[in-house]
Amino acid sequence: MQKQRLLNVGFGNFVVAERVVSIVNPASAPMRRLREEARDQGRLVDATQGRKTRSIIVTDSNHVILSAIQAETIGQRFIQEENS
C-alpha cells in the first residue's frame, strides 16, 4: 500500500498532496467565480475556520478548498513534502 503524503492547509486541516492541482491567490475575479461555482455545485471545502481566505487549492477531483494560509506558504510546504 502506497503511503499518502498530507499537506497542511492550516488549523489542523490536511489535503492529500498528490491530489493537488493548483494553489492560487483568491483575489482575482476568475478565482472568485471559481469559488462561487464550487459553492453552488457542492464542491467547496472551507478550511479557513472563519478567517479571511488567503489561498484557494484546486484538486484533481475538481474540489475547491479555501485556506487562511498564504498561497506561498502552502506552496513551500508542498515542495517540502515532495522532497521528503
UniProtKB/Swiss-Prot annotation:
Q: Which Pfam family, an example, fits this chain?
A: RemA-like
Residue ranges annotated as transmembrane are none
Coiled-coil ranges per the record? none
> Which PANTHER family does the UniProt entry name for this protein?
REGULATORY PROTEIN SSL2874-RELATED, REGULATORY PROTEIN TM_1690-RELATED
The entry sums up its family as follows: Belongs to the RemA family.
HAMAP family in the record: RemA (MF_01503)
Protein name per the record: Putative regulatory protein Dde_2720
Source organism per entry reads Oleidesulfovibrio alaskensis (strain ATCC BAA-1058 / DSM 17464 / G20)
